[in-house]
Amino acid sequence: MRQEIHPKYTEVTVTCSCGNTFVTRSTVGKKEMNIDICSECHPFYTGKQRIVDTAGRVDKFKKRFGGMKKI
């Protein structure tokens, strides 16, 4: 097996937008990583229904197709 062909696998501190932080291991190459959603705030794990909107896509969709009548 060839040596030194695999990326470095180091500890990374992950910070969610909700404020939750945890340490994991990754090949990302950074010491810190920011994410938008984690298991502490994801609707599937919390049981709360909410729309997870990235960059206003839901609002854009509603603006574009909200006035249409049902078929």
Curated annotation (Swiss-Prot):
Q: Give the range the annotation lists for the signal sequence.
A: none
- For this protein, the parts annotated as crossing the membrane are none
| Cofactor remark from the record | Binds 1 zinc ion per subunit.
Look up the record and report any one GO term of the cellular component aspect.
ribosome
SUPFAM superfamilies per the UniProt record, alphabetical: L28p-like (SSF143800)
Q: Which molecular function terms from Gene Ontology are attached?
A: metal ion binding; rRNA binding; structural constituent of ribosome
Instruction: Give the matching Pfam families.
Output: Ribosomal_L31
- Name of the featured protein: Large ribosomal subunit protein bL31
Annotated organism of origin = Francisella tularensis subsp. novicida (strain U112)
